[in-house]
Regions:
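Membrane-interface helix-loop junctions and terminal tails of multi-pass membrane proteins
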Residues: 2-322
Length: 322
């Protein structure tokens, strides 16, 4: 057997260099893969961060459309059932159906006061508020246009009462909106409740808010009626005013919703005095949208929502302390 010749220094150096090149060749693809993975991770992180910090969502058009349609339907139901005893239940049931139908898309606010309340609770981005409000008021206006067309242009609205302000009406709208928003915030906080259960809870919250406001309206109107009767007897009532009687007497119920208030109307003199079903010829239909309704519902919604946050926070703090 032939013996192996010892390797020369030159051969040894050549072999070492070859091994080094091979190791570098293997290391380069590995390093390249690591760098590419890091770049992909950075890009993904940046994309997610941009999506999270984006002011407007990608489905903004869907939100606007669903809010418009939802407010349109709610307004029609509120107007058609406004003079029925069970109107709060009909309106609450309608809201329940709307939450089930469009809640997953826009949250089914269909009420500028709810949008403002959620914004005050930091549950809604500021940039979205104008879009919600625009869609909601457009929905209510669409209901007015439809009713005007169907009634042969007799359902025209007058906004001469927009600047009117009654502390009594302000109070009932504020309390009703606060009760409604308190219940809504409580329902939304219950993560274990199914969507159908939340829809029922939100609808019932609106029903209870309307019932509470309606209960408060009765003493307000009684006080206004007594004051008006005393004014008639003493001759201090101005018969040439826009309303011959106190403003509170022309209101048939609370709205708790500025968009619905835009389409809702006050009673006319003939309806109030003679119990007529429709306004007399030449009488104006005064819109319920006024400073008292707008300010009361917005403030009430903010108070109700944030009051629940306060109560819920204190409750959790006490549980942790115990």
């Amino acid at each position: 057997m032939a013996s192996k010749k010892p390797m020369t220094k030159k051969a040894t150096a050549t072999k070492s260099a070859s091994k080094k090149k091979t190791a570098e060749a293997v290391a380069q693809p590995v390093e390249k893969v690591v760098v590419e993975e890091e770049m992909v991770e950075v890009i993904d992180t940046t994309t997610k961060e941009c999506a999270r910090t984006s002011l407007l969502p990608g489905d903004l058009i869907n939100i606007v459309i669903t809010e418009l349609v939802g407010t349109f339907i709610l307004t029609l139901v509120a107007l058609s059932t406004g003079y029925f005893n069970f109107a709060p239940f009909y309106v609450g049931l309608t809201l329940t159906v709307m939450v089930l139908a469009i809640g997953a898309v826009s949250g089914s606010h269909i009420n500028p006061a709810v949008t403002f309340g959620l914004w005050s609770m930091r549950k809604l981005k500021t940039a979205l508020v104008p879009f919600y409000w625009a869609a909601q008021f457009l929905g209510a206006m669409s209901a007015v246009v439809l009713l005007n067309v169907l009634s042969n242009n007799t359902f025209s609205l007058s906004f001469d009462s927009f600047m009117s302000f009654s502390w009594g009406i302000f109070a009932i709208e504020l309390v009703g909106a606060a009760v409604f928003m308190f219940g809504l915030a409580a329902v939304l906080s219950r993560q274990e409740v199914k969507p159908s259960g939340k829809a029922v809870g939100i609808g019932m919250s609106l029903t209870i808010g309307l019932l509470v406001a309606g209960t408060l309206l009765a003493p307000v109107q009684n006080g206004a009626y007594k004051a008006a009767r005393g004014g008639v007897q003493s001759g201090t009532i101005d018969q040439n005013k826009q309303h011959a009687l106190p403003h509170e007497l022309y209101v048939s119920g609370a709205t708790l919703n500025p968009a619905v208030a835009l389409a809702a109307t006050e009673k006319t003199d003939s309806q109030l005095k003679n119990g007529a079903a429709a306004p007399a010829e030449g009488e104006k239909n005064y819109s319920r949208l006024s400073l008292e309704v707008i300010t009361a519902t917005l403030i009430g919604a903010a108070l109700g929502g944030n009051l629940f946050l306060l109560v819920n926070y204190r409750s959790k703090a006490e549980k942790l302390a115990n």
